[in-house]
C-alpha cells in the first residue's frame, strides 16, 4: 500500500500551468507589462515601505501575510537575476504577480501591480536603483522643510527687531528725560563706556590679560567688584525705585499727647472747650434752678 500513491514534481505538473496560461490569455493586461527589466539594477529595500503602505490602503488593515508574499516574489526575482546571464530577460513577470495577488486584492490587484511595475521600471533606469518618483518627493519634502525653517527664522528675526526697537525707544526716552533734568551724562559717554565694557568681556572670555576696569582685576576685597561689571541697563532702569520718598512722619498716639483722652480718642480742642462751657453753663443753671426751687418750698412752708 505504501507504493500505491505516487506523485510528480511541481515542475512536471501540467494542470496548473495550463490553467495559468489560459487565464493569462483571457485576461487583458496593461501595455507596460511588456517592458523587460533587469532586477539586479533595482533597489528592493527602497520599494518595501511603499509596498507596505499601499497594501494597507487597499486592504483596509495591516496584513503581514500579503506584504511578506510580495516581498518574497521580489527577492526571489532578484536572486534569479543574479544567476541569469542575459540582462535583457526579465526574471519577474508582472502578469504572474497580478494573478497571484488577485485572491487577496481582488479588483485592486491590477492597479497595485501596474503601479509597482512602473516603479520597478523607473528604478532600473536609475543608477542608484531608486524610482524617479521617490527622488522628486524627497526633494519636495526637503524644499518644504527649508521653507518652514526660513519662515520661522524670519518670524523670530522680526520679533527680535521689534523688541529691540521698542527697547531702544524706551531707553532713548529715558535718557533724554534724564539729560534734560541734568541727572546723568550724555549718551555718547555712556556708549563709550559700554564699548569698553564689551571689549573687557571679550578679553576675559578668551583668556587674555585682564583689563584694569575688569571685575577680576587685582583690587582689595572691598573694591573688587566694579560698578560697571553689573548690567548698566538694569541699574539705570531701577535706580529710581530705591530712592527715599518724601513721606509724612507717622504719629503714634499715646496717653500723654494733647488732644486725646485716656482711651486714645481724639477730640478737637475747640469742640472740647465749647462742650465744656456748655456743660458748665447748664450745670450752673441747674444749680440755680435747684436753689430757687428749694427757697420757694421753704417760703411756702
UniProtKB/Swiss-Prot annotation:
Modified residues (Phosphoserine): 86, 199, 291
GO BP annotation list: mRNA cis splicing, via spliceosome
Gene3D superfamilies: PWI domain
GO molecular function, one term: RNA binding
Region described as Disordered: 145-301
UniProt xrefs under InterPro entries: PWI_dom, PWI_dom_sf, Ser/Arg_repetitive_matrix
A Pfam family it matches: PWI
Compositionally biased region (Polar residues): 290-301
This protein's UniProt keywords: mRNA processing, Nucleus, Phosphoprotein, RNA-binding
This protein's record includes keyword Phosphoprotein: yes
Keyword field contains Phosphoprotein: yes
Biased composition (Basic and acidic residues): 145-182, 189-205, 215-229, 254-289
Chief place of localization: nucleus
The protein's name: PWI domain-containing protein C825.05c
Subcellular location(s) of the protein: Nucleus
GO cellular component entries: spliceosomal complex
Domain PWI: 26-137
Biased composition range(s): Basic residues: 244-253
PROSITE patterns to which the protein is assigned, alphabetical: PWI
